[in-house]
């Protein structure tokens, strides 16, 4: 087998040190299991120079946020497009189906076609159970398509064979409403005991309390399970080192626990006392609100809950800058649930939600901010949403419940059991939302998706 080489398959350098694409050995068909590395971990696992060269070489071909495996897909696609390869079959985690990763599959569809796919199947990687996708593609000459072991008319770039939602566009009307939470970039978070100790510390030379810079903190687990009572040290987005040091106990905690890690990274060492990505837009949008909506990024069920300032949302959750029950109700409806399941990706067997693909493409009954004032349909959704939230709160924290009993009362456990009262509350909410859309109560999930896609197309074209 003289045509098998031990080499970097996606990046090489010429004699001057400039990045170039490596030449792959001649072949008719390529079958492979490329290495997996999440896009967010590439700089920490590889070095900055390598990643910068990779980005430069594949600029406008592979999104910078995409996982490492996508570069093998793009390289194989380009060889097929140039007539140097007939077809390829590659394996990736099932996140290839969505987000930035899906762009490489869209390029495959633009210059050729996908003729085979196993969209989501279990796999063992380094002893751990993961979910993978298998994709076979060519120049479009293969007429027979197979998807998940069955014949299909077509295989879409999200590895579905049903209604193709990949054409859905982000709607301008939904912008600046949903935000990824704060990325702390170090152990700024505090357990309840440590938080109490730091909050009670006095004697700051600026005369200010530590509540200025220590806030309640919520991530996905606080939503799906029980609130853990964690706090986080947060010096905001622009506080200087000198001003931060005036909060003596919190600053010394960060100096001891965060600084050593942050100084190892070129990108975070200069402002090691500040969070790595403090999400300025999110903070600005939530400023002055009495409450806001949160949802976990990855969860078995698509759950929404209320939170309130000064709570800081972690990057494992998303915040919505709306405080009204109507908006909460539409998000928690069947319409938004099935749309987000199709538009999102997954982590292992749990759906992953992202604002750009799941929310910003989602057409609400009326463009946000354009809800008709006093409309009975808006009030019906609001009332059903308030009722759902009220019933859930009472179930989560019943009067007189013991601590062991409370530990079992989580939203995940509630939706696992899905008692009749919860089913009835969601049925009432869905009925109100469907009425606002002008749908019948017996509309199928597939027809919901068709209606939403048509609305997305109409609004996106109208906004151009």
Question: Which residues make up each language-model segment?
Answer:
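S-adenosyl-L-methionine
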Residues: 5-6, 10-13, 26-129, 156-464
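Short, charged, solvent-exposed linker or helix-capping segments at domain edges/interfaces
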Residues: 16, 144-149, 373-375
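Conserved beta strand-loop-helix elements of the APE1-like EEP
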Residues: 131-144
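Conserved P-loop NTPase catalytic core
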Residues: 148, 153-158
